[in-house]
Amino acid sequence: PLLGPAKTFINHATVDYETTEYLVAECARMGCAFLNAPFTGSKVAAGNASLVYYAGGDKELIERLQPFLETTATQIMRVPSPLAATILKLTTNLITASTVQALAEGLSINAAHGIPADTYLSAIEPNACASTLVQMKGPSMAKGDYSPHFSLSNMLKDARYMLDLARRAGLKTPGIANTTDQMQKRNDLGEGESDFSILYRQFKQK
């Protein structure tokens, strides 16, 4: 096998609970080091070396790999375990997906009452709900530009993993459950490769 003692396996993919446990167990069985380091940031962020890694693994391993990770990152956040890295990545994506769904609803309500999108977005700017995400997605959603920065199919995948995390904890999460349903509808219409902000189209077509 390619993996074994003196080898290191780094996972950057956003995977589910079960896959994370599998990777931890398999690397332990083969004797190789394992670092789970999913990240937040886009292709542009990677090119600008401004990703943020959630690094879950042995402390000494993270320190050894830090120079490698820093080539594409502004921050390496050490977290308690590989599983914690997965959970943190998924639950931050939960906020991202839910925020865009809420923004789609807000834009649609304003449009229905004759208030222009730019007026609504300007009203958000000084409000506590303002965020980098809203600044990024709001204008493009208003224009109907769904060029992919993070695809609907990928966010839908992550949303299913989020629901699995909630189920394992015995929690009901109606907010992300509804957003998942809306993403599934768009995906079923063949829009999976568009940006996940295409959630707005559920209102634009009515």
Region roles according to the model:
Residues 8, 14-94:
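Rossmann-fold dinucleotide-binding core
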